[in-house]
UniProtKB/Swiss-Prot annotation:
Record-linked SUPFAM superfamilies: Serpins (SSF56574)
Keyword DNA repair: no
Database matches in PANTHER family: GH10112P-RELATED (PTHR11461:SF211), SERINE PROTEASE INHIBITOR, SERPIN (PTHR11461)
InterPro entries the record matches: Serpin_dom (IPR023796), Serpin_fam (IPR000215), Serpin_sf (IPR036186), Serpin_sf_1 (IPR042178), Serpin_sf_2 (IPR042185)
Family assignment from sequence similarity: Belongs to the serpin family.
Sorted UniProt keywords: Protease inhibitor, Serine protease inhibitor
Cellular component terms (Gene Ontology): extracellular space
Positions bearing the site annotation: Reactive bond: 372-373
CDD domains found in the cross-reference section: serpin_like
GO molecular function, one term: serine-type endopeptidase inhibitor activity
Stretches assigned to coiled coil: none
Protein name listed in UniProt: Uncharacterized serpin-like protein MA_2613/MA_2612
Amino acid sequence: MKTLLIFTLTLLCSGCLEDTAVTPINTINPDSVEYYGVAAANNAFAFDMYSKLVQLESREKNNILFSPYSVSAAMAICYEGTEGTAKEQISNVFYFPANNTVFKVRLKETNDKVYSGSDGYELENANAIWVQEEYPVKEEYIFNVKNYYRSEVTNLDFVEKPDESRDAINEWVEDKTDRKIKDIVPKGSITDDTRLILTNAIYFNGKWEHEFDKKMTSKKTFYPTKREEVSVDMMYISSNFNYSENLKAKIIELPYKGNDLSMYIVLPKGNNITEFENNFTVNEYTELKYNMESLGDVETSIPKFKFETKTELSDSLIEMGVADAFDLKLANFSGISEIRLLISRMIHQDFIDVQEEVTEAAASTTVFIGSVSSSKSKSREFKADLPFIFFIEDRRTDCILFMGKVEYPEYEGTGRFWSLPWNK
């Protein structure tokens, strides 16, 4: 799995945003972040962000995939240099503590755990800041992003050599994502006003602890809605997995080799994913997950799926409460430079590939700135032939690294849809 985020800070002379109604979402008390820690803050933001992406999905009818951990990590680099009300708003939406020292120390501790890795999988993280040559970035900011965020800092000539700069950044992105994300910085996006580009990349490639047997994969029917069917490649395995259920949903844990990371799949009962996800909270997810037990084999069927998504996050973040950072008059990144900066655009692009042996995914964000248990003797079934929500999580820290929804699974040659004249 690979995740990439790109943040571009652009100095603009005009084009301020209009006044925007701010609707912050408070899943946890931001004042309590220091008590909850980085994982609780990250996971609360994950569910807030998911609720916003659902609103976009309702208009475009797509699957959902994003990396809350990467979005938060990239925004944290911005937060390091943010002051005033812009800082307060980022703190509220991302649940960052007001104390920068506490935050960056805690974040570094968490990152060190998440990326300590093992021989059973590959999980890497990389940050980079690309700065316009001779642009006055504060030395303290450069020191902090290098030491606490493990960020590279490279000078480029955006003004005189925009194409060469674009090529250098795109090559870095492709290298960090195993060539899954290409041309993340499109032609014409680097202008005379571009001053900084911040990139964050996460790469994950892991094999299942219990691999699915390819011989058991067969064509089965998946029901995206009560009136639609699609033929999919359904994988099957019967093994001793952690599992639980309540009146609303089932959950199963599919660990990766090394047992540091797992995929959790939440399967709502019935076929009404919209109603379920509109009421599904981080606390309910945590309770459902922590009620899991390993009581014997679970007959598990999940579809192979492979898809890409690309989402403009700027409007969603503004609606969530990060408004000032996108407004030239109100943005305050004085911790980065004395020259006024703003975030003008933020794009998140993702890729995921789930098959019998491995999971691989990539995500990219570009910001332009200027329990019911069964007995042991009874076989349990987890048949994901309806839309489901999935998480890829670090078990050591409980941080959600990736979150998404599969409503229309497709995998190279599959995905033939037809409507039903009846309700399932």
